[in-house]
Curated annotation (Swiss-Prot):
Taxonomy of the source species: Eukaryota, Metazoa, Ecdysozoa, Arthropoda, Myriapoda
GO CC field: extracellular region
Family named by the database record: Belongs to the scoloptoxin-04 family.
Propeptide feature ranges: 15-18
Signal peptide: 1-14
GO MF term (any one): toxin activity
Keywords, in A-Z order: Disulfide bond, Secreted, Signal, Toxin
Intracellular or extracellular location(s): Secreted
Name listed for the protein in its UniProt record: U-scoloptoxin(04)-Er1f
Modifications the protein undergoes after translation, according to the UniProt entry: Contains 2 disulfide bonds.
Bridged cysteine pairs (disulfide): none
Keyword Methyltransferase appears in the UniProt entry: no
Expression sites by tissue: Expressed by the venom gland.
Native organism: Ethmostigmus rubripes (Giant centipede)
Amino acid sequence: LLVCLFVCWNAVGAQDARSAFSSEETAQDQHVMEERIFINPCRKPGKNACMENCRSSPNCKTMSFVQSSIRP
């Protein structure tokens, strides 16, 4: 639960940082907002809901991959 939220939330932070330097800032911001909307349910207590949502969300999978690529 915490791992999924941590990875997804950090990925959104990284996306925020990149969007500031992106020529596609509007598109980036829209994607960030979609990611935040996806994350909201993960804040609620739940056994496997967060991990299941994380695995089933294409956005989260993509952002998790990007985050792992950023950090060595």
